[in-house]
């Protein structure tokens, strides 16, 4: 138990350091949790978009409507925010599982963020995924991709056919696309056969995925809890992941991959 706690602390420290390598400057426009900026949280979006007016060590002040904020850790600031919820249909379970799972996220994000900050898209084939991915005009605005579908240790089901991770990777790996964090709610995609290769893609900043079968309700609750900590409370990805996994019953199968390495 002590060894696991030490590993978690080390991973959280590394995650914070990596987050801070995204350097900020005075004049940068950033997003910050309204609670971190001590603003009224009763707003359409949990985040506040503003300009950095002062930086000191690892903290920054941002411009408010009639004042400036107190110092906020730079680890709580992000320059970009856009979430894509990508449902990968299979015909058989869409009405009973995939659509309800996607809709649970839609309702949650409608409470958390403004409408323009979340995009929803459905595909059933690699061709549809390829057309959608290639025609996105604002790839750099998407920072997080949530995959809703069926998975196993080396593939994801598109329509009625299982497609290997390499086939999916070849489509997503476009030149010049800003790296994104992927949260896969597809069963077993956290296993090394899928997660290791996927997390090495230039388009993948990191991958969060289960290494076992996961119930749809647990997947939904874990995902919502993760984004609660990440966006509403302004925690780092590593801290948000650990807290979401600890807080969600039976969510211990979720793993976090980065650059081909299992980091949590």
Where are these regions (language model features)?
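Mixed-charge, Lys/Arg-rich low-complexity intrinsically disordered regions
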Residues: 6-26
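Short coil-to-beta transition motif at edge beta-strands of beta-rich domains
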Residues: 21-41
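Short beta-strand-centered aromatic/proline hotspots
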Residues: 42-55
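Short aromatic-glycine-enriched beta-strand elements
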Residues: 58-61
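Intrinsically disordered, low-complexity, charged/polar segments
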Residues: 65-82
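A domain-level signal for caspase-like cysteine endopeptidase catalytic cores
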Residues: 79-147, 151, 161-165, 179, ...
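Active-site microenvironments of hydrolase-like enzyme catalytic domains
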Residues: 143-156, 201-207
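Active-site-proximal C-terminal subdomain of hydrolase catalytic domains
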Residues: 181-264
């Amino acid at each position: 138990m002590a060894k696991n706690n030490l590993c978690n602390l080390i991973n959280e420290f590394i995650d914070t350091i990596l987050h801070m390598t995204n350097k900020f400057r005075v004049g940068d426009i950033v997003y910050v949790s309204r609670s971190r900026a001590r603003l009224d949280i009763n707003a359409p979006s949990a985040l506040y978009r503003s300009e950095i007016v002062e930086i000191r060590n690892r903290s920054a002040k941002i411009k408010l409507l009639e004042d400036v904020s107190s110092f906020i850790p730079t680890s709580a600031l992000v320059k970009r925010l856009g979430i894509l919820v990508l449902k990968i249909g299979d015909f058989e379970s869409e009405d009973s599982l995939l659509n309800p799972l996607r809709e649970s996220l839609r309702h949650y994000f409608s409470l958390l963020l403004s409408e323009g900050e979340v995009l929803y898209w459905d595909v059933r084939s690699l061709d549809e995924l390829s057309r959608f991915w290639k025609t996105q005009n604002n790839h750099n605005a998407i920072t997080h991709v949530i995959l809703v579908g069926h998975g196993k240790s080396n593939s994801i089901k598109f329509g009625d056919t299982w497609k290997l991770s390499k086939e999916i990777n070849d489509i997503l790996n476009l030149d010049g696309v800003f790296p994104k964090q992927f949260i896969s709610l597809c069963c077993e995609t956290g296993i090394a056969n899928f997660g290791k290769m996927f997390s090495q893609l230039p388009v993948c900043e990191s991958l969060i995925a289960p290494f076992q079968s996961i119930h749809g309700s647990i997947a939904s609750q874990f995902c919502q809890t993760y984004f609660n900590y990440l966006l509403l409370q302004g925690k780092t990805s590593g801290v948000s992941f650990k807290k979401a996994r600890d807080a969600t019953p039976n969510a211990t199968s979720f793993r976090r991959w980065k650059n081909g390495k299992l980091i949590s």
